[in-house]
UniProtKB/Swiss-Prot annotation:
Keyword Cytoplasm included in the entry's annotation: yes
Organism in which the protein naturally occurs: Pseudarthrobacter chlorophenolicus (strain ATCC 700700 / DSM 12829 / CIP 107037 / JCM 12360 / KCTC 9906 / NCIMB 13794 / A6)
Catalytic activity: octanoyl-[ACP] + L-lysyl-[protein] = N(6)-octanoyl-L-lysyl-[protein] + holo-[ACP] + H(+)
Annotated compartments: Cytoplasm
Protein name: Octanoyltransferase
Keywords assigned by UniProt, alphabetized: Acyltransferase, Cytoplasm, Transferase
Residues the UniProt record annotates as site (Lowers pKa of active site Cys): 141
InterPro entries noted in UniProt: aa-tRNA-synth_II/BPL/LPL, BPL_LPL_catalytic, Octanoyltransferase, Octanoyltransferase_CS
BPL/LPL catalytic domain boundaries: 34-214
Main location: cytoplasm
Amino acid sequence: MTLEFSGLGLAPEFVDYQHAWDVQRELHGKVVAGEAPSTVLLLEHAAVYTAGKLTEDHERPFDGTPVVAVDRGGKLTWHGPGQLIAYPILKLKNRAGIRDYVERLEAVMIAVMADYGIRAERIKGRAGVWVKADANGPDRKIAAIGIRVLNGVTMHGVAINCSNDLAPYGQIIACGITDAGVTTMSRETGKDIRPADIAERFVEEFRKHEEALVSSPEGALL
């Protein structure tokens, strides 16, 4: 196998965002240089707001809470306990296949949620994974995606809402979306689902896409 998975910390060990960002950048440089294999980092963050490159001033926390600016795509979001974070640092087999990469990330998360009876899906024009409007509420986001590809190697990744508190989203315009809500796997099922509960299934589903996504150590990027 050319893909590895590394756990940086799950509850009760929450990972500081800056530390995870430093690990990402160091690992990214090694993968670009061929000094480390493509690796997916799995973790839970300590609570933090992060702002992607498209974030506008009016979307920032209403109470003035500090925000970490990052170089991923997308807008403002929150990370914290109860969210499974996955940062794939992958040498892409097809450098032009960014849309395919995003769709595969979505497919992994949709498959994991299906195990719990959650009908998660894509919604045209909206990033991430969603539960469509029903008797329980409007369209609601259950997982976010924000990535960057530099020198053919991916950074940043996905956040799956498992059991996290939704109150922090009330202080921001999450991902720039004003006409939809946010939810968690626990809220949709009525069960307590933690990041540690789904991490192994996430790995299993991700491995199904390894051959299509990841360049072998000996292979040149297309």
